Amino acid sequence: MTRKIPDDNPISAKKFMEELRRYEKGSVSRRHFLGVTGLGAATAVMAGAMPMLAGSRKAFAGSIGDRVSIATWPNYYNPENFEQFTKDTGAKVQISVFGSNEEMLAKLQAGGTGWDVFVPTNYTISTYVELDLIQPLDVSRLPNFNEKYLIKRFIEPGTVNGKLYAVPKNWGTTGFVLNRKKIKSNPTSWREFWDLTKTDASGRVMVHDYQLTTIGNALKYFEYSFNSVDPKELADAEKLLIDSKPHLFAINSDYQPSMRSTDAWMSIAWTGDGLQLNRDIPEIDYVLGKEGGELWSDFYAIPKSAKRLDAAYAFINFLIDPVVSAKEVEVHGYPVPDDRVTALLPKEMTENPIMYPAKELLDALEFGAAITLTDPLRAEVMARFKSA
């Protein structure tokens, strides 16, 4: 399915593409293009994809410091974009990779991360606000942020108590990947995923080192809510996890290397990893369990402890530029809730069912709930599972 810009927006996706092509061919002036598309304030970051704007990007050079630090997820960025940002500004991008929101929360609470930008998931932002670990954003410093083009359901969690704390990065789903050359059956459910873990795929299965998804999808075996904190339901999920533990290859949120080497044949997975693996190794498929699971959206945000604010704002604004963001998507395969970006993506991506699942599959999914991030019972279940 292809996302379309609503009719009440100032420019449609089709019109945006028409104007972009006209501008690239030199048929219209720079002023005309920027005015018609509403990207006039974004010239500083558009220049990487449009050399005609290059002069304005150089204004950043030397003015934001020598580095910017981002905490993000595995396989979730385009290195060429980071290199371009360094080339344009002189600020080197330092990357910290984490595998769960619990890990990110713990590091921020401990202090001293040195992060300027981090990538929280939708359900965690209200907790960061409550704990005073995140700072509200000054929208005037993010000219590429334009709500008119954004899909509402994926951006709402970024606003808490009327203040904007985070701007959308990507959205996606949590399902599982499997190597169809190794697994001959055709699983379509979480029940089949966990049953295969203990039978035909024993010793070849990975689950996330992340309680939300690993516990959540164990809960789906029993058709409980992905977000359940009910003691009896969590006890059922814990028994399933501990019974499955001897049959696992690994507990790790970075599962691509093992899937590529065929050390693992099946793993809990996110949209973009599923697309990357399927693109490179067609026998690896991505499946959304029919019982449901997780729908999520990730954001760019600035920690309360950030010291390099000029670099943080410049970096976020660069990354949410439609052209830069499209380059991100083409590499990692996670959709963006920004219709300006979708308009720039190739048809083979906008019509790919891994990126844009069928409505009936999406309708069965749940957004993560804030309570799961700090619920002690879920934390205890995950700890006992990992130590079993």
Spell out what each predicted region is:
Residues M206-Y210, T214-A218, F222-G289:
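Ligand-binding pocket segment of bilobal, Venus flytrap-like solute-binding proteins
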Residues M1-H32, G55-R57:
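N-terminal secretory signal peptides
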Residues Q135-N146, A166, P282-E294, P303-A306:
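Short beta-strand->loop
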Residues N9-S12, F16, P257, K359-A388:
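Conserved C-terminal helix/tail region of periplasmic/extracytoplasmic solute-binding proteins
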Residues S126-W171, S185-R191:
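Hinge/lid segment of periplasmic solute-binding proteins
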